[in-house]
């Protein structure tokens, strides 16, 4: 719905960028983990996720009036991703050790992705409005983090299970913020479209 809003209004007003950028890097990192582990669920989901998040980042950059900060953040996280790729492929020859290090790297990025929408927490409390938060993204985050936690539990993979638990917690916190500080009549909650 945020992408649809940007295309309709040709504006990025009241839409956060950082959650989508960190999600894109997160998808690309987990795609590498899935390839190394040969887990087709991780590969498929994160390939689709990375493609969609990259589309969002490009549309956001196109409609953003302040392109320089958006581009700098994107390039910074891309540099981190490239440095991580070089580290994991060139400096760690053992596949088991590489899988453990990459799992830890992905876990840290997943936690940062789930915490990034809370960057505006002080602004939300001060303004008593959740206009800058996306309700559909909150619902999706809750469902995704719950699903991945259960998937990690089923596989006995702590790298998948543990970092997704903060997603559940931060989603519940954002649901509370939406209840406590409604976004107002200019941006009501829209239902998720299938």
Stretch-by-stretch model annotation:
Residues 1-194:
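Alpha-helical membrane-protein topology signature
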């Amino acid at each position: 719905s945020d992408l649809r809003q940007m295309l309709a209004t040709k504006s990025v007003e009241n839409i956060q960028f950082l959650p989508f950028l960190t999600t894109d890097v997160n998808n690309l990192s987990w795609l590498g983990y899935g390839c190394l582990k040969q887990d087709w669920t991780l590969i498929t989901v994160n390939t689709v996720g990375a493609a969609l998040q990259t589309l969002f980042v490009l549309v956001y950059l196109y409609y953003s009036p302040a392109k320089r900060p958006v581009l700098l953040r994107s390039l910074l996280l891309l540099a981190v991703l490239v440095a991580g790729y070089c580290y994991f492929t060139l400096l760690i020859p053992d596949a088991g050790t590489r899988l453990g290090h990459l799992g830890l790297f992905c876990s840290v990025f997943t936690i940062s992705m789930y915490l990034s929408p809370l960057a505006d927490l002080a602004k939300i409390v001060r303004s008593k409005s959740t206009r800058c938060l996306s309700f559909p993204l909150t619902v999706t985050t809750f469902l995704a983090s719950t699903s991945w936690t259960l998937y990690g539990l089923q596989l006995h993979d702590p790298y998948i299970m543990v970092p997704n638990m903060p997603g559940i917690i931060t989603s519940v916190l954002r649901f509370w913020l939406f209840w406590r500080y409604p976004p107002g009549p200019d941006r009501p909650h829209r239902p998720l479209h299938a």
